[in-house]
């Protein structure tokens, strides 16, 4: 019989693994230094340190030395897995370890030189699996080693952020030396990973490997691990933490009650107020993160790498780490709020995004930490109601701030943010929260509640993740469901955000208050959800019916289901259930993006233009989860009179705030054109990149200033569909139309799968129709055809149009034919404000400017155009200017001045209106563009290309 102490396993693993990487590095440095530090962009001396991939996989003999030594690591590696399994008895942990080991073999033996994509897939898989592996191993470790492992794991994942940053600097910015700095962090991950497994030494000393013959003749065993009994440090530690937590609560309860009596009960004023704010903070941070992420793929025109910040929603996974759950219980609201809201101080967009991701991660984890311990029925409903009222408060506040949340990091004091006020409130309620919410951790699991099966937990997790997505997609702004129903102006057009956004807020408030009636009774809400989803998915149902029976009914059904979910989740305390919920939420968010961004993402065709499918799946999962909740819910709740008195007070406060905001954002008067004496229409076209400027700040105020300065009567805005999760569910027309005192038509809605277009007009919009142009391959091209009532009741047609991508030639050909026919079908004077992606005088240009369309170019001699074009017909062209964008967006503002003529004047001018001949000064002073943008201009705006405006006879 041979007995070997288990400590030899981590020792052998550490020696073999470290030797493999170290030997390859030394050999590579000695033989091929210049070759292994060379990358796609730079070589020595700009780069001076090799990446792991270049070191282990590019050259002989270091590649062979590495692979031999790493092969020797396999035996102690699998012994390490078996030893951990014996100690913690966790099959899930063992399975993750095996998959992690296989993925390690993938990126080790398939190098980046062999197949770059496969190598990266295995590498990413390995890093992703390292998270649950480190957490579970740390959780199940003895107290002696858990701190060391926890610290090592924390440093490991903290190192990922600067590593990703420097990789982007290398691959996207092509910055010299960036790859060497990236390599430092990459090698640090290797050392930290080896060190983490080395800390198993203390745990493995407690076991022996026994090699012996079996007592039965003829039978032998390869080996067995012998010990008196399995040691489950995780259970011991969990028990200790739970006991210490119970003691802590017991200590705090008398202190709180002696100081404030019953103020800290579930029906107390302070409990309700604090958790309404916490609910508001939750939704503010959750919506802020995705709104910030969107800036990066937008400006990189593709996947940038910063999208990984979406993993911040998986904050609950950190509750597995020792002492983290207790820390978040005490300081989660405070830390999460300060970091996420305070991120506005950070000027660099990349670092601001990381700050928001960290803060949101803590906020989400703190929410989960509270929710998973609430087992009392009354406390559960009180917590659910305050969470809903926090949601309603955020929606009302967004309505009052023109659909921007004033706590978001895309705002500061310069563009309407109230970040400092939010920080003060966060500190106040963050300090109150651990005391007020101590009641959430009281009580035991109700004896009447049924234990959930694994399948039940899965359904509950998937349902809750879908519920979060559904609320975020349609119910985080008062105008989202309105725009799902909007089809343009006509005699019986649908609701507009003002004043009907207030109805959305009121219905959401009603649904929140009445949700107590449906706690544990999901059948009616599920039926309403089924009906409303069908209405929202039906493209034939539009305007008021879609808003009422789709949008409002959906809001009622969703909010009625929340208390049932909260009650059931309180009976299921497993952290993985919540991690799975937010994973499902992330998957649905990506699907929500894929339906529009299919041309820019892998496998985009799968979900192309299928928002209804995404909605249907989410509603189906919500219903299945809700029916599962029914089996887990405890007895009916009975809330006292005092509770409803306080709730009534908060409801009245929210209704009053709604009324105040409706009054504040009312139209300021009847819009009037700037130059009625000359009967001028000053029209512009501008691509505004979804209202986010180059530095990730909301740009509405700066856009308003330029539009005012240029005295635009009509403006077409492109890339405006911000009524999506990733754009913050914002309505750019809300503030623009209000502050500019203009009518607004929000083009094809968020359920039409376009990037959006908007028409703002000083003239009444008599009629407007929305068009989706042929796009068999690329992105959908949106268009608005609006008829404006101008001077002397002369009707003028305005077309706002965004064509497809440069790569999709057939799409653009079909779209040009469609637009030419659409413009040619009307004989009224017309203006096209467009984004055509064509050279002047070439290709599809000759379809837009043709006998079929009847349209003419505002200046055929301007040959420095590709994207934006202004065409016209039946109007007298008097001026044309191109204005630099500043840092608002990536595209200039083009402006044309046109004079509306009487029928007699039209006959007199006839074809002379289209003759070319420009001047440096206008015919009349009233027709002049502002001088402030001559020369260097103001605020980064100046006349460019011609360096001054052009005027025409």
From Swiss-Prot:
This is Protein CWH43. GO terms for biological process: cell wall organization; fungal-type cell wall organization; GPI anchor biosynthetic process; GPI anchor metabolic process. Pfam families: 6TM_1st_PGAP2IP, 6TM_2nd_PGAP2IP, Exo_endo_phos_PGAP2IP, Frag1. Involved in the maintenance of cell wall integrity. Required for the replacement of the diacylglycerol moiety by ceramides during GPI-anchor maturation. Coiled coil: none annotated. The active site is at 802. GO terms for cellular component: cellular bud neck; cellular bud tip; endoplasmic reticulum; endoplasmic reticulum membrane; plasma membrane. The gene is CWH43. Residues 1-229 are annotated as: PGAP2-like. The keyword Chloroplast does not apply. The keyword Metal-binding does not apply. Residues 29-64, 113-117, 171-175, 300-307, 352, 402-420, 472-495, 539-547, 607-613, 664-953 are extracellular. The PGAP2-like region interacts with the PGAP2IP-like region. Keywords: Cell membrane, Endoplasmic reticulum, Glycoprotein, GPI-anchor biosynthesis, Membrane, Transmembrane, Transmembrane helix.
